[in-house]
Design a protein with these regions (language model features):
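Active-site loop/helix belt of alpha/beta enzymes
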Residues: 1-70
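A residue-level signal for beta-strand positions that form part of recognition/binding surfaces
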Residues: 48-50, 79, 90, 129
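Generic, ordered loop/turn and secondary-structure boundary motif
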Residues: 57-59, 65, 79, 101, ...
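Short coil-to-beta-strand transition motifs
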Residues: 72-79
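Conserved hydrophobic positions within beta-strands
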Residues: 82-83
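C-terminal accessory subdomain/extension
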Residues: 86-184
Length: 184
């Protein structure tokens, strides 16, 4: 099922359920729904008063792996340093579960997407380190920086005090995360 069909089905189920409840006398001033995919299918939002468009602002490995987004549309990236290279096919980076989270994506193995290198897998995490593998020789050395698209973009901004807006390889602005670690 494509994301447009999924969005329509979810909309129809939500609005249909609300109509059944209203017919029984229940009052609903707010009908809240939506997800990352519905942000591109606004025609299926009629009747919904509050749209929750998921991580559409960032995208992540889930939206990338399902074809909803391409790599260039994934705005959130964690920058990590290669700290150890055991051989041509295995390395350790300084981004672990505290950065990338242990959330898995059912659409592809591993704990993130190395930008520009979809063949590389982050196979294991401890708190401060990630373990990287590739069937091909790894294209980086100790000290190199790599950008990683997280499996689940919602978690990473909650773990940091600020993120940087980068355009054309230059930092354009620093964005403070005022709700960091809070449940509002």
């Amino acid at each position: 099922e494509g994301y447009e069909a999924q969005t329509k089905r979810e909309h129809d189920e939500l609005v249909g359920t609300a109509e059944l409840l209203r017919a029984k006398g229940y009052r609903m001033d707010v009908l809240s729904g939506g997800n990352s995919y519905s942000a591109r299918c606004c025609k299926y939002l009629e009747g919904i008063t509050e749209v929750r468009c998921g991580n559409y602002i960032f995208n992540d490995v889930a939206t990338l792996a399902t074809g909803f987004a391409v790599e260039q549309e994934c705005a959130l990236r964690a920058v990590s340093t290669v700290v150890c290279k055991m051989d041509d096919h295995h390395a350790i980076i300084d981004a672990g579960s505290k950065t990338l989270t242990t959330d898995l994506c059912g659409h592809r193995p591993g704990y993130g997407w190395v930008v520009g290198h979809p063949e590389i897998r982050i196979t294991k995490l401890n708190e401060e380190h990630g373990f990287v593998e590739s069937d091909e020789p790894l294209p980086f050395e100790i000290g190199d920086k790599i950008a990683i698209i997280p499996n689940h973009a919602c978690v990473l901004p909650n773990l940091v005090d600020k993120i940087y807006g980068i355009r054309n390889g230059r930092i354009e602005r620093m964005i403070p995360i005022e709700a960091r670690g809070r449940y509002l």
